[in-house]
From Swiss-Prot:
Protein name, UniProt field: Forkhead box protein D5-B
Keywords, in A-Z order: Developmental protein, Differentiation, DNA-binding, Neurogenesis, Nucleus, Repressor, Transcription, Transcription regulation
One Pfam family from the record: Forkhead
Organism of derivation: Xenopus laevis (African clawed frog)
Location(s) in or outside the cell: Nucleus
Length: 353
């Protein structure tokens, strides 16, 4: 007995017994139906304009909604077959960050260039063309490339040549950093490269205009210094003094008999210990000392005592190492011993403080 035949025997209402019989038949039919008819079928009053199936008509929309609810897609969000999320999700999963450090990426870019040197823009172009991840993230990582170039010793900055116009300097690899990566693999470095102090000196020579700075710094040879141990100071005996005002030899010979009164007063107070006279022990600022004509001291020539022990390396040095006033000691009495005084003018030589 089919469902349509059972519904045709009733006209306006159903008995309680009739309803129970129909529910038993619905259970039988629900065994093969993918929708659970017990929970989703419901009774509706029949109308004249409805067909035979209008009394107990399961809604297809309710069935499809039940399927979607049972799968958990209608309440949980969008379905797996949604075209909006699947292409975007697949595209994001495809852009995986490469397992290389920035130093490895820069090294790849420099090694593939014909001249083994590139600018910052050339390095960024190479990385963007080889790795889609960095192409999508550009220019967020450009500053990281710039910082790695300037902070790592394995990269050398080469200024542009005068006849090569353009923007930015070139960057190349240090020749001593070729074994920086383990077995040529860019995935792992052996150790951090450190440049030696001598190589720092060579790198500094490249910045001068008079040198071929466009060459690699390894081709430059350090210039030998003219004087390895410059003369700092020269030991002068205590008996050696030097006049304050340097004058030529004829003037010194002429003025030696007429010294200044101020210098004589300064020397007079210091010679009191060597010549204990009552006249010299008086105050140097008295009227008698000021009005009295000073004695004319005899000029004395420099006396080289036995305790003058000059080293051979000082005597063998060129004359340009000494002051011009000390060049000609034998030509005139430039240095005089003034009555054994111990107040001298210190001679400062180049390099002394």
């Amino acid at each position: 007995m089919s469902f349509s035949q059972e519904s045709g025997t009733h006209h306006n209402s159903l008995d309680y017994a009739g309803v129970s019989d129909e529910e038993d038949e619905i259970d039988i039919l629900g065994e093969d139906d993918p929708c659970s008819l017990k929970s989703h079928f419901y009774l509706q009053p029949t109308h004249s304009d409805m067909g035979d199936s209008g009394m107990l008509s399961p809604s297809k929309l309710s069935c499809t909604e039940s399927e979607s609810d049972s799968s958990g897609e209608s309440e949980g969000g969008t379905s797996k077959d949604s075209p909006a999320t699947s292409p975007g999700g697949k595209a994001k999963r495809a852009l995986v960050k490469p397992p290389y450090s920035y130093i490895a990426l820069i090294t790849m870019a420099i090694l593939q260039s014909p001249h083994k040197k590139l600018t910052l823009s050339g390095i960024c172009d190479f990385i963007s063309s080889k790795f889609p991840y960095y192409k999508d993230k550009f220019p967020a990582w450009q500053n990281s490339i710039r910082h790695n170039l300037s902070l790592n010793d394995c990269f050398i900055k080469i200024p542009r040549e005068p006849g090569n116009p353009g923007k930015g300097n070139y960057w190349t690899l240090d020749p001593a950093s070729e074994d920086m990566f383990d077995n040529g693999s860019f995935l792992r470095r052996r150790k951090r490269f450190k440049r030696h102090q001598q190589e720092f000196f060579k790198d500094g020579l490249m910045m001068y205009n008079s040198l071929p700075y466009y060459r690699p710094y390894s081709a430059l040879q350090p210039q030998p210094m003219l004087q390895q141990t410059p003369l700092a100071c020269m030991a002068i005996p205590e008996t050696l003094s030097m006049p304050t005002n340097l004058t030529p030899y004829p003037d010194i010979k002429r003025k030696a008999h007429y010294p200044d009164q101020g210098a004589h007063r300064g020397f007079e107070g210091q010679d009191a210990n060597n010549h204990p006279n009552k006249s010299q022990s008086k105050c140097s600022f008295s009227i008698e000392n000021i009005m009295k004509k000073p004695k004319e001291p005899e000029p004395s020539f420099p006396s080289f005592n036995s305790h003058w022990n000059y080293n051979n390396h000082l005597l063998q040095r060129p004359s340009s190492c000494f002051l011009p006033a000390v060049l000609n000691l034998s030509t005139g009495p430039l240095l005089a011993n003034v009555q054994g005084t111990r107040q001298y003018n210190l001679i400062k030589f180049p390099g002394s403080y």
